[in-house]
């Protein structure tokens, strides 16, 4: 018997309910598909709340921990990472209502115990959670897990982007309608003992909002708790909810609206209601009544004093971060004296601000006299859609915060239009043949015959793949092209219409972009004879998350196209004439080179060197020798973290890892990232920052209206914070914010991975990306940002941009200012207020 009587204080399908649905959906952070897996702040939906309140809320609503276990902090205290002064500073900064001891010694005593309070904080329960708590055996627990598995199975079929051989019927319908059409023939739930499942779903309204309202009413969710309940329901299918949030993000970026996530929410709450309808027994209904009474209590997310254990862990986390900032500021204070500017550099190399570039830049500067390196976002200020040969649409090579402004097509150099057409036709034909062959191998009948008859023919391929001699699959970037053509591929910047769209750059656009990029990099002279614009990518095999190791500023793709486009435009003689009229004089003998830094092997590839004049042959030879030395030094430094012993074969082992299909840690990615520094390179040159800092060159004295400062704080700084918080979340709670064990991953729908063969879509980073099997390689620290600019200018950017204000005022990062003398002089305290620091001290 189903209790259809609506209790008091519930919501009907009103604008208030629609608002609760929208807010619950916006609490979910998006996750990008595997083809362009970019780092995302898992707390993005809580940017309007403080870090502390968000941690409390997630613990209250979903019992999700966002801090490390207390044993982690105890170990940091024992090994000297956290000092007594750090604990004292954290206590002094803690709000008074946290009811903490005033002395560090007392805090140390409390930290020795894992828990001091008895009562856990209140939670907003879902039907699944109450069922799990009451389960006398495994059956009801299995039902709640079964619900997640069934929703995930349906989502995998509905959202599939070409992996499945058989397409799901009704994919043309919107999600809620498509799911109800699917359920009409799905007897799995009833076989699991969920009586009348299909009838219960059919009884729901056709409109998804009305269906949510019906469930809210029948469950008796208190009006105050509706948003929390809906949020908790989404968290139980958090991976697929995150993918639906990505679809919503993309539509909103284009000025449209998408309700996929809201419809997925309707599917989840209706599913939960079918479980509720099974239990009419007194024990369950009494437990549910108590849960709803608890949910009706007003939350106190901003008043943490009622949960002393949470407060202790939070202040220990603060002390842990203070300890890092103390060491960082001391290191920066010991920087060598800045060299006098003005002399022409021997070589200039612009790298992405990615923390992996810091190691290579330091190595490059140490092995060559007159080497000048620059840090800038890896898309080099060119927000392009790059369209490979044979594709109708392209890939966004820019931060996901932006939309591409230009379309650039890939082309084979030195060909006529007729040859281009032949190359295109041949590539499409080969890809179709491969697709047909794959379909044959995977078909229901031929798969068995194929394995029996042709399996041995692949023995050589399996052996060569296992020995890391060959790739396990064709490189999708060059699939279907002849080897002699691959080396001639490159972006075409000449303007021409393609498929009814304008592509390339006209003369005015080239000049405007060239000036903007050079000024944003603070690169206005003097210029070296060779200037490297170095994007980055990675080389791995059998790695579903491979794009996550590529350039985040390029939307999860390599920075090759952007670097080559920028170099081609800056080498344009007409552009240089126009730049001279705008105050940027690039010498005639300066040549820009598009380059690509492979962060797995630390090899730098130089493009279009055949276009170098003969006068630069010696320059090129010296550059290659310098890069070889820098590569060797960088590999040796990274080898220690990879667990590779130093020796004659060290460098070869680094390269071998990039081709090893069994390697779960081909490189460490951005593990360890902890700081972002926007200042002239002179402030950090010669300092070993351990590959943990995003380094963005910025000279505020060249930034007349502080437009570049605004660009840095609203784009690269925000992206760096996203990366930092993704690593933070995947470290403190990999089950909730990470992707689990990479060894167990199975790709689903080409969109993401499952851990095993069922369960929710995984988000975030695999465990192997933050842990080496015995210890954490990534330290869970919020980003420390240091900017050399006047306080008034920084405040101006904060005041004008909500996205920045929320980050700094709500403590999602720590902001510091560097004085014109190069000293870290002020700490941001919120609401446009700063505290002056004493020299070489931490607050």
Swiss-Prot record:
Keyword entries, A-Z: Cell inner membrane, Cell membrane, Membrane, Metal-binding, Transport, Zinc
Keyword field contains Transport: yes
Domain of life: Bacteria
Principal subcellular localization: membrane
One Gene Ontology MF term: zinc ion binding
Family to which the UniProt record says this protein belongs: Belongs to the inorganic carbon transporter (TC 9.A.2) DabA family.
Protein name from the UniProt record: Probable inorganic carbon transporter subunit DabA 2
Provenance organism: Bradyrhizobium sp. (strain BTAi1 / ATCC BAA-1182)
